[in-house]
């Protein structure tokens, strides 16, 4: 007999609505158990979905998705949503090649109303949907679910300001898993919130306001008392000042209370914000104790059959973490900045050793970059540790605030290139293209860990903005040396061959060496995208017939394009054959990195096919 007696009956939200409300608590427990069992096989984002279980059940119980729009922010918390919307049996394939995505994806399900992976987008998207439906005469409801971390992003505030200003009918649910209210106040707050969210209070409050508006002094007094009274029990919030009807905080794990509150708010028109308190990792003791560790789990995390051992080779993030700690010990001007990526960027040790020189600015990439600019203006040396995919979000600041003023800011760009299982939303496919066109920048592409370490050093000492990009995961195990023959804008000949020259940008150097063995080709580690080693390009063009460029970045506008531009400017394009190999002009699905590289023709077999046609 199945242990999922209720869950087995549910494949869609329509099935969920047939379940008696009294059984929703049991269903929530079954969903958690199913999530544990499934991710023990597949791995995936874990703690966030555990924390949002009751909220997800209540949303699909009250609202009529997909007619009603439920928009999720970031997407880490949507595994329960996927289970309840026809993908229960596919959850074991999550983030695998040919399997379902780890994030909401419009092409995957009609219930995934808006594709996501980055944060702070939900309210903007939901507002657009609400207005579009209203303009087309559709009577749907629209809900945005956003976490207390994501709501710190500036885009979320912009959307709140817009929605409140135009009084659009939209519900924003703030999923707060940081427990910002102390326990002794929390009980009173929950009690008071039940009164505030009650239908009777709603009715009296709105009708009373209409009457009291005719007596301005009394109206202002009552309004002030209500605001001050709520302020005694809830965090000082500005949501009502933005035009939102604020309700909460309420217990995000009380599914009965959630259903009751959502039903009331569904009938309340205008912009509304429901503040729910949840616990990340709820229902799994280890995840509750260490939600960061259990944010994402590997297969067998629960059964323990395959214990994951620590990688024998350090990751590129580890190399950065070591470098910044060592450099900070020598230079008191160094400050480290990250937009909510302390663990991923390996800044934990730095934050512990130098807490007054470490700044986690939360999910605020634009602020992170301009903040670094302000630090640089006053003589400090800021290092911005940021993922490639998130650097995109601060593009104007990179240009206007840093490059235009030629400020000393070092960008340590992690997760450059393909990231694998997280897919297109997290791939670092474009940074070479969008950074290369900006004046005053130095752009470095290390081929191994040792180059990465010394390029960070070179970029730090450079007078102006500099960027070092490196991939996710471990390198080749290169030893970190005390010194390296590394000169600004100078490439390195790795292997001398003839006829064919392979210009490598970044960590595809092993691929270049494999091709060189097969074709007796010259291999050059270009190291710098900007400035290019033009002397090396001149030499190569004079001594070789075919030139290949390799990069784990989009071909359009990337390092290969820079080489093409140089050869065209020198009138050499008709004298040599140049072929660029990089990421194709399309978004890739999730999968293993080797598979995605092969799909991008970045493998010996595919490049050999092209070369054989040219020889």
Swiss-Prot record:
Gene Ontology CC annotations of this record: cytosol
Transmembrane regions listed in the UniProt entry: none
Any one GO molecular function term: 1-deoxy-D-xylulose-5-phosphate synthase activity
EC annotation from Swiss-Prot or TrEMBL: 2.2.1.7
Cofactor: Mg(2+); thiamine diphosphate
Residues involved in Mg(2+) binding: 148, 177
Keyword presence, Transit peptide: no
Pfam families tied to this protein: DXP_synthase_N, Transket_pyr, Transketolase_C
Domain of life: Bacteria
Assembly with partners or alone: Homodimer.
PANTHER family noted in UniProt: 1-D-DEOXYXYLULOSE 5-PHOSPHATE SYNTHASE-RELATED, 1-DEOXY-D-XYLULOSE-5-PHOSPHATE SYNTHASE, CHLOROPLASTIC
Protein's name according to its UniProt entry: 1-deoxy-D-xylulose-5-phosphate synthase
Organism: Francisella tularensis subsp. novicida (strain U112)
Encoding gene, per UniProt annotation: dxs
């Amino acid at each position: 007999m199945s242990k999922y007696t209720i869950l087995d009956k549910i494949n869609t939200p329509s099935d969920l609505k047939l379940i008696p409300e009294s059984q929703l608590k049991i269903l929530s427990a079954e969903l958690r158990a199913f999530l544990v069992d499934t991710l023990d096989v597949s791995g995936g984002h874990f703690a966030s979905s555990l924390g949002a279980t009751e909220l997800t059940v209540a949303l699909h119980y009250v609202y009529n998705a997909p007619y009603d729009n439920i928009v999720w922010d970031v997407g880490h918390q949507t595994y329960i949503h996927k289970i309840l919307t026809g993908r229960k049996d596919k959850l074991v394939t999550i983030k695998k090649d040919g399997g379902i995505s780890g994030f909401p994806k419009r092409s995957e399900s009609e219930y995934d109303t808006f594709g996501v992976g980055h944060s702070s987008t939900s309210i903007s998207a939901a507002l657009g949907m609400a207005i579009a439906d209203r303009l087309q005469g559709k009577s749907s409801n629209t809900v945005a679910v956003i976490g207390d971390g994501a709501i710190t992003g500036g885009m979320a505030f912009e959307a709140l300001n817009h929605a409140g200003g135009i009084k659009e009918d939209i519900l924003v649910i703030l999923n707060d898993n940081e427990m910002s209210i102390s326990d002794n106040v929390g009980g009173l707050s929950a009690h008071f919130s039940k009164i505030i969210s009650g239908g009777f209070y709603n009715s009296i409050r709105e009708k009373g306001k209409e009457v009291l508006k005719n007596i301005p002094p009394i109206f202002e007094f009552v309004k002030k008392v209500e605001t001050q009274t709520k302020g005694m029990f809830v965090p000082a919030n500005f949501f009502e000042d933005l035009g939102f009807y604020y309700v909460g905080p309420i217990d995000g794990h009380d599914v009965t209370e959630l259903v009751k509150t959502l039903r009331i708010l569904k009938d309340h028109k205008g912009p509304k914000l429901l503040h729910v308190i949840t616990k990340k990792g709820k229902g799994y003791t280890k995840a509750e104790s260490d939600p960061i560790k259990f944010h994402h789990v590997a297969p067998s995390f629960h059964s323990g059959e395959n214990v994951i051992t620590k990688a024998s080779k350090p990751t590129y993030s580890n190399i950065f973490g070591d470098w910044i700690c060592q450099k900070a010990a020598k230079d008191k001007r160094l400050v480290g900045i990250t937009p909510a990526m302390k663990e991923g960027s390996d800044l934990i040790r730095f934050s512990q050793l130098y807490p007054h020189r470490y700044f986690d600015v939360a999910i605020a990439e634009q602020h992170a970059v301009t903040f670094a600019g302000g630090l640089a203006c006053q003589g400090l040396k800021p290092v911005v540790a940021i993922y490639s995919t998130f650097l995109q979000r601060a593009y104007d600041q990179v240009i206007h605030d840093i490059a235009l003023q030629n400020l000393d800011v070092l960008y340590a760009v992690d997760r450059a290139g393909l990231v694998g299982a997280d897919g297109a939303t997290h791939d670092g496919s474009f940074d070479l293209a969008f950074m290369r066109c900006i004046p005053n920048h130095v752009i470095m592409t290390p081929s191994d860990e040792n180059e990465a370490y010394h390029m960070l050093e070179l970029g730090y000492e450079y007078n102006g903005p500099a960027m070092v990009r490196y991939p996710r995961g471990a390198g080749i195990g290169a030893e970190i040396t005390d010194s390296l023959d590394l000169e600004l804008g100078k490439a390195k000949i790795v292997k001398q061959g003839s006829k064919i020259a392979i210009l490598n940008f970044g960590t595809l150097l092993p691929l270049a060496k494999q091709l060189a063995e097969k074709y007796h080709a010259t291999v050059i580690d270009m190291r710098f995208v900007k400035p290019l080693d033009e002397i090396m390009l001149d030499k190569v063009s004079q001594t070789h017939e075919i030139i290949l460029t390799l990069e784990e970045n989009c071909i359009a506008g990337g390092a290969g394009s820079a080489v093409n531009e140089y050869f065209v400017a020198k009138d050499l394009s008709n004298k040599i054959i140049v072929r660029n190999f990089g990421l194709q002009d399309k978004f890739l699905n999730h999968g293993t990195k080797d598979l995605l590289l092969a799909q991008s023709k970045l493998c010996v077999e595919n490049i050999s096919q092209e070369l054989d046609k040219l020889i």
